[in-house]
Amino acid sequence: METLLKRELGCSSVKATGHSGGGCISQGQSYDTDKGRVFVKVNSKAEARRMFEGEMASLTAILKTGTVKVPKPIKVVDAPGGGSMLVMEHLDMRYLSSHATKLGTQLADLHLENKRLGERLLKEAGTVGKGGEQAERQYVDQFGFDVVTCCGYLPQVNDWQKNWVEFYARQRIQPQMDMVEKKSGDREALELWSALQLKIPDLFRDLEIVPALLHGDLWGGNVAEDSSGPIIFDPASFYGHSEYELAIAGMFGGFSSSFYSAYHSKIPKTPGFEKRLQLYQLFHYLNHWNHFGSGYRGSSLNIMRNLSK
């Protein structure tokens, strides 16, 4: 591993630190190099390169906003024996505690960044000598992402769409339901989904949604802090509805009331928020069902029943 990293990173010295970490999907290890300490995530799956390229693009996109701290990605490398590795900046992280309020503020800033950019460009339209910022940060007026990103190890369809409701139904829920059908042929789930599809547009009536850059998998295990403030990592980014971000955050805990208060002071809840949050949680329950098995079936079906009434 050390020899491979020397070659790929152009380093003269690479030494494992003994610091390791990992989750349900990938494992990681830190290395000291003459160019600084790096963290290397490793996954042996054949699709790992696509997964890590999506993560690298996600980290790069968030980094460019200058809103919330993420590890700086360095390179995706083919792993010896199959699979791939993602090399990134090593950050000394601890559990999120004292910086929860700041994370709420910074996450809202991340979600508002594209909207603010659009407003600024509109204001500057027709102004002579605007400078170079417009070329650096382009306003995004559609929902999607330039590359495939993975929530867990399953790829997300990120083809650009103008309509958020169609994007979410066709490119988030439908692929998950297709996997459920293929694996189990669960007739009750399929019937509930058919009924729910007719109700979804009602949840978005009179709602204007500006595409927001999302982390995409913001559960408690993907947030942390250091002495300077909060850190988010392991993203599965795309441009979507800002409310989507809060769905998985509320499913498994790890976020204090101060986080939500700070967030909603910048992005207030709008009518229908709670039902849309359930709709967004449906994706994550289905995604967990397809990753980890039928233990998540009941939660998935309950949401579809509740929202189909």
From Swiss-Prot:
Disulfide bonds: none annotated. The modification Phosphoserine is found at S20. InterPro entries: Fructo-/Ketosamine-3-kinase, Kinase-like_dom_sf. The keyword ATP-binding applies. GO terms for cellular component: cytosol. Its EC number is 2.7.1.172, 2.7.1.-. It comes from the Eukaryota. Belongs to the fructosamine kinase family. Ketosamine-3-kinase involved in protein deglycation by mediating phosphorylation of ribuloselysine and psicoselysine on glycated proteins, to generate ribuloselysine-3 phosphate and psicoselysine-3 phosphate, respectively. Ribuloselysine-3 phosphate and psicoselysine-3 phosphate adducts are unstable and decompose under physiological conditions. Not able to phosphorylate fructoselysine. Gene3D superfamilies: 3.90.1200.10, Phosphorylase Kinase, domain 1. The keyword DNA-binding does not apply. It is an enzyme of class 2 (transferase). Keywords: ATP-binding, Kinase, Nucleotide-binding, Phosphoprotein, Transferase. ATP binds at E89, H90, L91. It catalyses: N(6)-D-ribulosyl-L-lysyl-[protein] + ATP = N(6)-(3-O-phospho-D-ribulosyl)-L-lysyl-[protein] + ADP + H(+); N(6)-(D-psicosyl)-L-lysyl-[protein] + ATP = N(6)-(3-O-phospho-D-psicosyl)-L-lysyl-[protein] + ADP + H(+). The ATP-binding domain is structurally related to aminoglycoside phosphotransferase family. One of its GO terms (molecular function) is ATP binding. This is Ketosamine-3-kinase. It comes from Mus musculus (Mouse). The active site is at D217.
